[in-house]
């Protein structure tokens, strides 16, 4: 798949997820085979660009691969300025968020709320594309609500405005993350535009990845929640797409190494206090089985990086011995 001048090495992309796809997580996913990892959403409001959270999200030092930065907002001029600012900070691709279903984003008429207003969608896309000399991509949902799936209309507007590729989550804004993603609308979008289309939603196994590619005819897949606590899913899916065979489950020693490295990267990125808190949710995703409940409870009580690191080491030492 090609996005502007950038040829992706395969069909697997990491979905942008606020509070999840920071630099530490993106680099892990890239190492395990993702072709592209999109950053966390950044507000187009310049008043928040100087906050610690925004500065961390804008940091690209040590970033591996193609740098795609997602921006969100509802004002065409501010969105254009945000795009320019992030290109100056090192973004290779600007991604526009019209897919986030969160209430705090939608109440500002941003994210997937924009799909209710096609003229404003057009104004925003035209402004951002004109403002930068890098490819601009777009992420949407299938529509605002099940009765109003206007994804094809928005996709055609995107193509007319010069959007380089389009990612579509297979639910409406109203659906949030409930129920199952549907791929009929994504298939229809692919059939009605000539720009690359990326399918997103409930792609959590190699078999599901193969099904979605075949059913929709899309150019690539975007994986979000399926990679939480499992960055190696990209390796598993790519192997299956290439060979038709499933890889053996990740070995305990490798999982231990990944988790400990992830902890270290979180502490380095956020400092000990914030790093500890981010580590709690990531470790909760890595070890999410019922028989790991006590470990999660114990881990979440720890207040130092050294204690967290040591407990993960101890957990895997016990696992190997038993």
Curated annotation (Swiss-Prot):
Catalyzed chemical reaction(s): a 5,6-dihydrouridine in tRNA + NAD(+) = a uridine in tRNA + NADH + H(+); a 5,6-dihydrouridine in tRNA + NADP(+) = a uridine in tRNA + NADPH + H(+)
Cross-referenced InterPro entries: Aldolase_TIM, DUS-like_FMN-bd, DUS_fam, DusB, DusB-like, tRNA-dHydroUridine_Synthase_C, tRNA_hU_synthase_CS
Superkingdom, natural source: Bacteria
Location of the active site: 100 (proton donor)
Annotated EC: 1.3.1.-
Gene Ontology MF term list: flavin adenine dinucleotide binding; FMN binding; tRNA binding; tRNA dihydrouridine synthase activity
SUPFAM superfamilies on file: FMN-linked oxidoreductases
Chain residues that bind FMN: 16-18, 70, 139, 200-202, 224-225
Pfam families listed in its UniProt record: Dus (PF01207)
The protein's enzyme class: oxidoreductase
Names of required cofactors: FMN
Keywords: Flavoprotein, FMN, NADP, Oxidoreductase, RNA-binding, tRNA processing, tRNA-binding
Family recorded in the similarity comment: Belongs to the Dus family. DusB subfamily.
Physiological role: Catalyzes the synthesis of 5,6-dihydrouridine (D), a modified base found in the D-loop of most tRNAs, via the reduction of the C5-C6 double bond in target uridines.
PANTHER family (alphabetical): TRNA-DIHYDROURIDINE(47) SYNTHASE [NAD(P)(+)]-LIKE
HAMAP family: DusB_subfam
Protein's UniProt name: tRNA-dihydrouridine synthase B
The organism of origin for this protein: Shewanella oneidensis (strain ATCC 700550 / JCM 31522 / CIP 106686 / LMG 19005 / NCIMB 14063 / MR-1)
Gene designation: dusB
């Amino acid at each position: 798949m090609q996005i502007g001048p950038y040829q992706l090495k395969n069909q697997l992309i990491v979905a942008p997820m606020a509070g999840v796809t920071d630099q530490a997580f993106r680099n892990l996913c890239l190492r395990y085979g993702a072709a592209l990892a999109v950053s966390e959403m950044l507000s187009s409001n310049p008043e928040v660009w100087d906050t610690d959270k925004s500065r961390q999200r804008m940091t690209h030092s040590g970033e591996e691969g193609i740098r795609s930065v997602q921006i969100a907002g509802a004002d065409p001029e501010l969105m254009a300025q945000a795009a320019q600012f992030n290109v100056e900070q090192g973004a290779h691709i600007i991604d526009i968020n019209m897919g986030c279903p969160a209430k705090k984003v939608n109440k500002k008429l941003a994210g997937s709320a924009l799909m209710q207003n096609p003229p404003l969608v057009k104004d925003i896309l035209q402004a951002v594309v004109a403002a930068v000399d890098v490819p601009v991509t777009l992420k949407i949902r299938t529509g605002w609500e099940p009765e109003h799936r206007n994804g094809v209309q928005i996709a055609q507007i995107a193509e007319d405005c010069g959007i380089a590729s389009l990612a579509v989550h297979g639910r409406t804004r109203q659906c949030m993350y409930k129920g199952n993603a549907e791929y009929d609308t994504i298939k229809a979008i692919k059939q009605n535009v000539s720009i690359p289309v990326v399918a997103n939603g409930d792609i959590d196994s190699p078999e599901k990845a193969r099904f979605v590619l075949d059913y929709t005819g899309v150019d690539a897949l975007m994986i979000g929640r399926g990679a939480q606590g499992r960055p190696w899913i990209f390796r598993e899916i790519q192997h299956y797409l290439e060979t038709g065979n499933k890889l053996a489950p990740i070995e305990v020693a490798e999982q231990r190494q990944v988790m400990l490295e992830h902890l270290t990267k979180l502490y380095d990125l956020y400092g000990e206090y914030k790093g500890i808190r981010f580590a709690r949710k990531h470790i909760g995703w890595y070890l999410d089985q019922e028989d790991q409940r006590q470990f999660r409870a114990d881990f979440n009580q720890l207040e130092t990086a050294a204690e967290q690191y040591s407990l993960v080491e101890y957990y895997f030492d016990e696992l190997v011995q038993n």
